[in-house]
Amino acid sequence: MWLKLFFLLLYFLVLFVLARFFEAIVWYETGIFATQLVDPVALSFKKLKTILECRGLGYSGLPEKKDVRELVEKSGDLMEGELYSALKEEEASESVSSTNFSGEMHFYELVEDTKDGIWLVQVIANDRSPLVGKIHWEKMVKKVSRFGIRTGTFNCSSDPRYCRRRGWVRSTLIMSVPQTSTSKGKVMLKEYSGRKIEVEHIFKWITAHAASRIKTIYNAEHLKEEWNKSDQYWLKIYLFANLDQPPAFFSALSIKFTGRVEFIFVNVENWDNKSYMTDIGIYNMPSYILRTPEGIYRYGNHTGEFISLQAMDSFLRSLQPEVNDLFVLSLVLVNLMAWMDLFITQGATIKRFVVLISTLGTYNSLLIISWLPVLGFLQLPYLDSFYEYSLKLLRYSNTTTLASWVRADWMFYSSHPALFLSTYLGHGLLIDYFEKKRRRNNNNDEVNANNLEWLSSLWDWYTSYLFHPIASFQNFPVESDWDEDPDLFLERLAFPDLWLHPLIPTDYIKNLPMWRFKCLGVQSEEEMSEGSQDTENDSESENTDTLSSEKEVFEDKQSVLHNSPGTASHCDAEACSCANKYCQTSPCERKGRSYGSYNTNEDMEPDWLTWPADMLHCTECVVCLENFENGCLLMGLPCGHVFHQNCIVMWLAGGRHCCPVCRWPSYKKKQPYAQHQPLSNDVPS
């Protein structure tokens, strides 16, 4: 989890640096920044109208370019970033969806029960044509949707009784707005009574009703009274402008943040004395001033603070978030972090997606479970001081320059989702590359596993868990005895013969390690046949001397082993755990035996160097209870125990897919034993 969190933070850092890189490219090519002010005089008439439409100001009665330019200047300063966003939004030809209501309950659930938004609904009476035609309605939907106003169509033929009860006997337009200034209050439905069925007139009617909810100040005395008043609102945003009514985006935000932020419009059109505004620090017109308990904040002086709905919405959300905003943010972060598993996990493709689905389910479940006590905690009484300090911390942190950069980057990447997804994919591929390289350096076999191998191992794990649940999750002790360790005794009880054994494929048997048992100083059959003539020419006296000398050396070794307890304990510790239980004598005591049919020397030591590193040293097969002879074929299991190849193959092929000694599954890997294996030079010759 911490690794994924680190990669996610690294990805956000990459996005931040990439945004600064794009700004540098734009500055190098054009010589301008996104925060640079634009002179409206240099803009065309079409671009000026685009700016007014994005801000929500009507221009139907302004035929001259000069009047349109003055209206843009009165509504606020224009930045290069806002101009670029407005032109890009105008060029986008995406169709905005509109809701078709199926009846009374559907209408009530979406319109009347929605307390923090505006709805524009076209009601079509029975056997009547709609008030607004299809083409004009599509333009209307596109125009109002940029201000967060949702639209829909209610056809009375689907529920005529509800239309009669409402008095909708003719086709009309209905607007739903919150009735009170409290959050989640009642809504009121207003019917359009205008005669002109045009987009601009309908939009003007909508903005007029939305602006009526904003507190408006017309004189300095009223401003002084309002400025010094302390009430329930911790955040107040003032618009000082020479306009008839506030822009539509300002009115839409006042409804969206009902109960959290108070919006106040100060109309300075007919003011003669503006000295009080100078006293409170208002020098320029128009000005967007945020009043907080800590002081005033001038909106529009930092990066990304445009005069638009999206920019001011993200700014206010960061200062006064809802619980739902925090939950959505945590949900996005958790899922972005969970998707990192797709690139961190190595091996088969199916394995990656299985791990991803498992991680997504786990993380989202834990997130929801974690939010339940948080919601319960927030409903406790006497938490006003906690809320106050938390919001104060948010206000301090989110009014910094760094926070403005983060908000600007958020708006940039949200308007370019393809860039966001491509950078996330590129970041993930880099993680996959370095993770694969790191695991290959560690000789990890899972990197090269294919889909079939992984599915086979998954099926083996599932069947092993289904039929032998303890063996699937319990790690066996490395050095222990059944009589001393009760866990191993319980493990043994988990495999009674009365249990059903899983159907496990025997393909893994051919991958088990196999090798020849050899002894030091003993030749193979070919070497024996080649050197037979030389052996026949040896003198009888030399053989007698050699045998007598070897016998003396053997007797000396036996005396040393019996007289030195430290050496004997060392020998027993180095032997395999099965030697004491299943072998008649320990490997050290078995040196006097013959290890091969061709060996007549009693002190020949097995050549342990030919054994795999993770195999336990033993000289007897516990299946047939016979000693290993020189040149015989051996096979080892993942647990480290060694047997005759024929014996263990017959054992496994009979359906007993476990070690005859420790009952470890013969198809399941196990950590190698971290113990010193005796070599030939450890025993004195």
Swiss-Prot record:
One GO location term (cellular component): endoplasmic reticulum quality control compartment
UniProt keyword Ligase, yes or no: no
Tissue: Highly expressed in the normal cerebellum but not in the cerebral cortex.
Family matches, as CDD domains: RING-H2_RNF103 (cd16473)
EC category: transferase
Pathway terms, separated by semicolons: Protein modification; protein ubiquitination
Membrane-spanning intervals of the chain: 6-26, 326-346, 366-386, 411-431
Biased composition (Acidic residues): 526-543
InterPro entries named in the record: RNF103, Znf_RING, Znf_RING/FYVE/PHD
Protein topology in the membrane: Multi-pass membrane protein
GO MF term set: ubiquitin protein ligase activity; ubiquitin-protein transferase activity; zinc ion binding
Pfam families named among the record's database cross-references: zf-RING_2
Keywords (A to Z) from UniProt: Endoplasmic reticulum, Membrane, Metal-binding, Transferase, Transmembrane, Transmembrane helix, Ubl conjugation pathway, Zinc, Zinc-finger
Zn finger intervals (RING-type): 621-663
Chain spans, region Disordered: 526-550
Chemical reaction(s) catalysed: S-ubiquitinyl-[E2 ubiquitin-conjugating enzyme]-L-cysteine + [acceptor protein]-L-lysine = [E2 ubiquitin-conjugating enzyme]-L-cysteine + N(6)-ubiquitinyl-[acceptor protein]-L-lysine
GO biological process entries: central nervous system development; endoplasmic reticulum mannose trimming; ERAD pathway; protein ubiquitination
Location(s), subcellular: Endoplasmic reticulum membrane
Subunit structure: Interacts with DERL1 and VCP.
Protein role: Acts as an E2-dependent E3 ubiquitin-protein ligase, probably involved in the ER-associated protein degradation pathway.
Name the record gives this protein: E3 ubiquitin-protein ligase RNF103
UniProt source species: Homo sapiens
